[in-house]
Amino acid sequence: MTIAVLGAGSWGTTLAVLLARKEYEVRLWAHRSEFATALEQERENRRYLNGVHFPDSLHIVATLPELIAWAEVIVTAVPAQALRETVRAFRDIPLEGKIVVNVAKGIELGTGMRMSEVLLDELPQLQLSQVVALYGPSHAEEVSKEQPTTVVASSPSRNAAETVQELFHTNRFRVYINTDIIGVEVAGSVKNIIAIAAGISDGLGFGDNAKAAIITRGLAEISRLCTKLGGDAMTLSGLSGIGDLVVTCLSHHSRNRHVGEEIGKGRTLEEIIHSMSMIAEGVHSSKAVYELSRKVGVDMPITRAVYEMLFEAKPAAQAILDLMNRDPRSERD
């Protein structure tokens, strides 16, 4: 099996290493040629995944069209907002018989599209049955060290999902399958926003009660958007739902939770982003999901509060107060 992994950040590198350790022929694409050269020479990603050695079967490239033509499986591990631009480079390359495994989590700004929708919109030769979303609670820092992790491979095509399951599955990286790609993608996108809210709670010095409320009511928001867009609410009880939500809201590895914590401490978004070496997808997703929720008529008060704090400079303490002072209602509304 020949596999191309697009995106040499921490997660793309981790998955490329995982697959190469299974002795597949893997090529990792880096956007900048000088970065690709450094990775190939140093045999590790010192910028994003320091200390993890590359297996001999993993090679680094910077040319995309030839790589896509060569690969049987394409893993897209670029930031969500860069997915369209990245795949546009192979719009004219035949993709028949190939599987595209997307691991980017987010909603596209401007269009409100999920990642599978972006792929199909930009690649007319691609069928939805060829697309698999690989999501779940899976920090690169732990997977790269072969710590136990479970994820879900989701596609309308059970055959495609099972192929990806077999491809990635190890005794330390357990892969389940699921056919509800809508629910999986919505959950994977919105959980980053809720993690920012959880971090804000930490930054303000609130306790476990507040964190539990944010996670629980955040899950309710995800459920409302999921069902509105055609997903199955039952998916949210799985790895891509509550599993990924909990780990992202609680973990010290979570970049989104970190952004929220710094906001809660009074730093500006510009200051926080400038100090980070990697992207927190929830920042862009908060704007995209807020706009999408208004478009489709779904009430998402936590998402709205995060949007207001990030993009309208609303004080964090005031945003929390406004959430708490909303009209009383049924828990199931």
Swiss-Prot record:
Coarse class of the protein's main subcellular location: cytoplasm
Keyword Lipid metabolism appears in the UniProt entry: yes
Pathway: Membrane lipid metabolism; glycerophospholipid metabolism
The keyword Iron-sulfur is annotated on this UniProt entry: no
EC number: 1.1.1.94
Domain of life assignment: Bacteria
Protein name: Glycerol-3-phosphate dehydrogenase [NAD(P)+]
Species this protein is from: Chlorobium chlorochromatii (strain CaD3)
